[in-house]
Amino acid sequence: MTDKSKDNSKSLLYCSFCGKNQKEVQKLIAGPKVYICDECIRLCNDIITEETIKQNNITDTENKINYLPKPHEIKKHLDNYVIGQNYTKKVLSVAVYNHYKRLYNFNKKTDSVELGKSNILLIGPTGSGKTLLAQTLAKLLDVPFTITDATTLTEAGYVGEDVENVIQKLLQKCKYNVKKAELGIVYIDEIDKIARKSDNPSITRDVSGEGVQQALLKLIEGTLASIPPQGGRKHPQQEFLQVNTSNILFICAGAFSELSKIVSKRLDAGTEIGFKANIKEKKQKKSEDFLLKQVEPEDLIKFGLIPEFIGRLPIITILNKLTEDALVNILCKPKNALIKQYQTLFELENVKLEFNAESIQLIAKKAMNKNTGARGLRSIIEGILLNIMYELPSMVNIEKILINESVVNSNSLPKIIYGKNKSKKASGE
């Protein structure tokens, strides 16, 4: 029995890498005086793939920086998706271009002047296009992008999200590829909601206001952050990822609804020289857009942002409140215009959807009255089209649906045009 087992072991072939015999593996591939099993082939393939991905990421990063669109090209792209806000688009185009050119300089690691990071603060009313501008930029540059609501953030140790979760969301967007995340854009919305609650220091700790600003300082400026992949509070034992935030572009945005009053007070105080000086000028009410364009860091400090936080956001740009004409253009002109979206949705049912000029003007007027900017347009159109979208899948032989001003005004049924197979009928005529 012993001799037979020795003979069997001699006849078996073994993998030259892991030492397993042919019975312990699925496949054993032979070469000149050497063998390799399927398990070792898979392992080698994984190693090569991992190295290739790393190399591709480095090359991809260099290519993105080297083939960066010029400011004119960036603005032109923004014009296709965002109506108005020309000055803000120029500011963003230059800021983003300079930011990624700075990365090229950083990667070269020359002994030249070190370029600082220029994060951005967007100030503008609800629905003026702040979020859309940032999203459009990220798509153009093909970099990871994440949106965080500042109101959900709290200081570490308190109920709410830690500020590190901002970077964790960015990592999720690029499947935890740290190198890609370090080139991303973080958009922090509602930044005005974390303003300091009072000018005077309080005994009660302001964990969702000044505390969050303090916690964000290092992250925005640039630091080596330890990020838990699955969130630190629920999984405290996990291995942390090291992410350098020095090259991440932070765009903070908010409505800053009371800021114009602070600016107005400062401007009025500056005109009070002499007895009854400039009384006529003071009585003239200045528009909110005009006042916000005069904003200074001292106004933001009075609003409740701490000086150190403002210092990390050197580029401040103001978005104008959208006019009725601008809302009309938003409905029709951009590549992803709302009316085009709903027309595409109806085309899936082989039905044409048309709005006449008067109905579009009325929709814009309704949004203006609600004071919700472009954000309110979708809810208005949803309300107008709800009944027809409910009935349409069950209807047959529909060719076209026409929306006129009476549909928008009184929510009556739209005009329905049937195909040639049936006699023409119309609802709401």
Swiss-Prot record:
It comes from the Bacteria. GO terms for cellular component: HslUV protease complex. It holds the Pfam family AAA_2. One of its GO terms (biological process) is cell division. Keywords: ATP-binding, Chaperone, Metal-binding, Nucleotide-binding, Zinc. GO terms for molecular function: ATP binding; ATP hydrolysis activity; ATP-dependent protein folding chaperone; protein dimerization activity; unfolded protein binding; zinc ion binding. InterPro entries: AAA+_ATPase, ATP-dep_Clp_protease_ClpX, ATPase_AAA_core, Clp_ATPase_C, Clp_protease_ATP-bd_su_ClpX, ClpX_bact, P-loop_NTPase, Znf_CppX_C4. PROSITE patterns: CLPX_ZB. Zn(2+) binds at residues 15, 18, 37, 40. Gene3D superfamilies: 1.10.8.60, ClpX chaperone, C4-type zinc finger domain, P-loop containing nucleotide triphosphate hydrolases. ATP binds at residues 125-132. Residues 2-56 form the ClpX-type ZB domain. Belongs to the ClpX chaperone family. Component of the ClpX-ClpP complex. Forms a hexameric ring that, in the presence of ATP, binds to fourteen ClpP subunits assembled into a disk-like structure with a central cavity, resembling the structure of eukaryotic proteasomes. NCBIfam families: clpX, PRK05342.1. ATP-dependent specificity component of the Clp protease. It directs the protease to specific substrates. Can perform chaperone functions in the absence of ClpP. This is ATP-dependent Clp protease ATP-binding subunit ClpX. It comes from Buchnera aphidicola subsp. Acyrthosiphon pisum (strain APS) (Acyrthosiphon pisum symbiotic bacterium).
